[in-house]
Regions:
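Phosphate-binding site of ATP-dependent enzymes
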Residues: 193-280, 301-308
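ATP-dependent carboxylate activation and anion-phosphoryl transfer catalytic cores
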Residues: 2-4, 10-13, 271-348
Length: 348
């Protein structure tokens, strides 16, 4: 059997660079080598594309604070076929070459999950796993996600947009959350308890983007759904719940550094009707934003039992603690099957 040539892109320029590397490391451990021939390019923080040996990626730790970007050969991209070679990625000395049939961009955050890399791949004519340029861009911007969902009568967490130079106002009272609109992994997010903390939280969020959201702190439960669509089956998984143990919210450190800071409850304890409502909402959001392949949809369940959209991730994490592959396994799609189905659907 001829194997499908799949190029994995990871790293990137965002604050989630290390998370992307860890996600890709674990994807490569799980993927079926008999069906797929793999290539690996790491995008470093200087935007260089590096051809990296898989063993070097596998050697990185799972704690992002201890991750160093692997070194490799710098690659160039040729978007057209010539007499000498086809469209693909090549080292400067042409000793390394890879002409992918499918690209799997395991990239999170700005520059990787916001339509940027998707636009590059689409312009190059390379099929890629995950959201389109439009869907990735919408899903990355929390304010735009919510604006579109409001038009579709989908309940969302209320929000107020503030930019540098605007009058800094909190219309919701305290506690509230201040966060960048276009960042993931809780980077730049602060839980604010008083007026005296608001300005510093705003300045922290500005380190990660120009558009800042202020949102009320929802009293209730944080619940997530994995959505999968390969054109043959459209799945909304059982629910998972995040319960913070040591922190006020699910921060970057709680997600990736301190394994005891939060408890992941899989499956979440919900009534049958509650789960059906949540799954229906997740599928609606996936369709409204025109997502493709995969997404994780994050909700709050407030004290009245109402579900509110928090955000959607169009390229969810695949780290050892990531909710998406765990929920898909609970839905009956194991890690290797999940990857294979996404790639085959993209190729076809």
């Amino acid at each position: 059997m001829t194997r499908t040539k799949v190029l994995f892109l990871c790293g990137g320029i965002s604050g989630e660079h290390e998370i992307s590397l860890i996600s890709c490391k674990h994807i490569l451990k799980a993927i079926n080598r008999e069906e797929f021939e793999l290539g690996l390019i790491v995008i470093d923080k200087s935007r260089r594309m590096l051809w990296v040996q898989e063993a070097d990626l596998q050697s990185i730790p799972d704690n992002p604070k201890n991750v160093k970007t692997p070194s490799g050969q710098e690659m160039l991209f040729q978007a057209y076929a010539s007499k000498e070679r086809g469209a693909g990625f090549y080292s400067r000395d042409s000793r390394v070459s890879f002409e992918p049939e499918v690209v799997f961009p395991i990239l999170h955050g700005v520059g990787g999950e916001d339509g940027s890399i998707q636009g590059f791949l689409q312009t190059a004519g390379l099929p890629y796993v995950g959201a389109s340029v439009k869907a990735a861009s919408l899903a990355m911007d929390k304010a735009m996600t919510k604006a579109v969902c409001i038009e579709a009568d989908i309940p969302v967490v209320p929000f107020h947009i503030v930019r540098a130079g605007d009058r800094l106002e909190n219309p919701f009272g305290y506690p509230c959350f201040v966060k960048p609109s276009e960042e993931g992994s809780s980077l730049g997010v602060s839980r604010v308890k008083s007026d005296s903390e608001l300005k510093s939280a705003f300045e922290e969020a500005l380190r990660f983007g120009e558009k800042i959201l202020i949102e009320p702190a929802i009293v209730g439960r944080e619940i997530e759904i994995a959505v999968f669509d390969d054109g043959e089956e459209f799945i909304a998984s059982p629910a998972g719940e995040i319960r913070c143990v040591k922190t006020d919210f699910y921060s970057y450190d709680a997600k990736y550094v301190d394994a005891d800071a939060a408890e992941l409850i899989i499956p979440a304890a919900l009534k049958d009707q509650e789960l059906k409502e949540l799954q229906s909402l997740a599928k609606r959001i996936f369709r409204v934003l025109d997502c493709r392949g995969l997404a994780r949809v994050d909700f709050f369940m407030d004290s009245d039992g109402k579900f509110l959209l928090n955000e959607i991730n169009s390229m969810p994490g695949f780290t050892p603690i990531s909710m998406y592959p765990k929920l898909m396994a609970l839905a009956g799609v194991d890690y290797a099957s999940l990857l294979g189905r996404l790639i085959r659907a993209t190729k076809s």
